[in-house]
Amino acid sequence: HRDLHLSLRRQRQMCIRDRYCEMLKRDKKRFENNLELLDECPLGSAALSGTSYKIDRTYTAKKLGFKKPTDNSIDSVSDRDFAIDFLYASAVCAMHLSRLAEDFIILNSDAYQLISFNDKMLTGSSIMPQKKNPDPAELIRGRTGINYGKLNSILTIPLTLNLTIND
């Protein structure tokens, strides 16, 4: 839906038609960049400063499908930037999806009635049977904060071994 244009609002008033694809393209690029950074094999890094076994790390990296072995064994086992990068990309993507979901909810509302959802995507209200709730969009909005929390959690874990990473 690269050419999907929606009516955008400022102060709850319609003002311009624009696309959402640019922010989602950036999100895709963030995930692609993250995958590229993960294309290094940590095998042989051991618990701290490498292994005493005579292994050819370049050979094993290639055999396992990695571009190359990691450059630094301490960095391989103690840094969490790979997880931070992924969680950051997830949080930004969630923010954009939340923004899009919010706009869909508003544009679907009785006040605007500019878009409509398929009935399969709606649920009825427990007290108002005529009311239809766009639950998927609401769930996207509601889950965004969880992504922020996970990013914040990993940012505050100290270097090297810390068992709270399992939470």
Task: Please state what every model-predicted region is.
Residues L163-D167:
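Short, solvent-exposed helix-loop connector elements
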Residues R17-T160:
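Internal glycine-rich alpha/beta core junctions
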